[in-house]
Amino acid sequence: MNIVPILQNIFSLTNSKNHTIIHFLGLRIKYKHRNIPEQSHPISTYVPGYEIHGQNNKIIIIEENGSERQLLPNEKIDGLNIRINADNSLVRIQKPTKFRDCTLLIENNNCTYDIKSTIYEIGGTIFHLSAPCCKIQIGHNLSTGCGTQINGFSSENVTVSIGNDCMISFGVIIRPDDGHTIFSPESKQILNYGKDIKIGNHVWLGEQVIILKGAVIPDNTIVGAKSLVTKQFQP
C-alpha cells in the first residue's frame, strides 16, 4: 500500500521565492518570507548610524525646545541603529532619549515609529515593522531591558501603543499578530488578522512577559514575570 498520497493529503509543504505554504488537515497556512536588507550584521546587532532604501522616508528629530528637523545624512542617534527598506515611512524621535544597543527595522511602506522623550534607558530592544501601514507609538519616559522585541507585524494597519511612564523588563515580547497568515481552504479568506495592542500609562511588564494581538492593559497595572496576555487585562 502506497501511503505517500495519504500523507500528502494530511501534510504538505510548498516553497516559492516569496512564500512557504503549509497544508495541514485542510488548513492552508501561507508564510511570507521576510525581505530583510542585506547586511553584514544580524538584526540584533547594534551598528551605529542608519541606512535607508526607498522613497519619501523621513527621520524627524524633535528638539527639547519643540522645534523639528530632519536627521542629517551623516548624523547618528546614539545607541539606535535605523534600517529602512520601504517607502513613505516616518520616524519621529523626541529628545532627550537614551538608547543603548537598539535597532529599528522598517521593511514595508507607510509605517510610523513615534517615540516621546525619556529620562530612562531603552536598552537592547528591537522595534520591527514588517507590514504596510503599521505603527509603533510610545509615550514619555519608557524604559526597557535587553532582549525586548516589538515585532510580528504581518498584518496591515496594526498599531502598538505604549503610554507614559512604562517600565518593560528583560526579554519581553510584544506581537500584534501571529507572524504568519492562515487562509480558509474553501473561501480563501484570511482567518487570523492582526489586532492592535494598547498598553496604558504607568504599566510595569515583568521579565519575559508576552503580549499578543488584541491585548489591552489599563493604566497603573503590573504584569508579573513570564505572564501571557492575549486580551483585555483585568487588574
Where are these predicted regions, by residue range?
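Short, solvent-exposed secondary-structure boundary motifs
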Residues: M1-L7, H41-I43, L71-N74, V229-T230
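Boundary detector for helix-to-coil junctions that initiate low-complexity/charged tails
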Residues: M1-Q39
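Short, surface-exposed beta-strand/loop "edge" segments at domain boundaries and coil↔beta transitions
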Residues: H23, L27-Y31, E68-L71, L90-R92, ...
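Extended, small-residue-rich solenoid/repeat segments and analogous flexible loops
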Residues: P37-K95, E107
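Flexible, glycine/small-residue-enriched loop-and-beta-strand segment within the central core
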Residues: S89-A215
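C-terminal/domain-terminus segments
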Residues: I217-P235
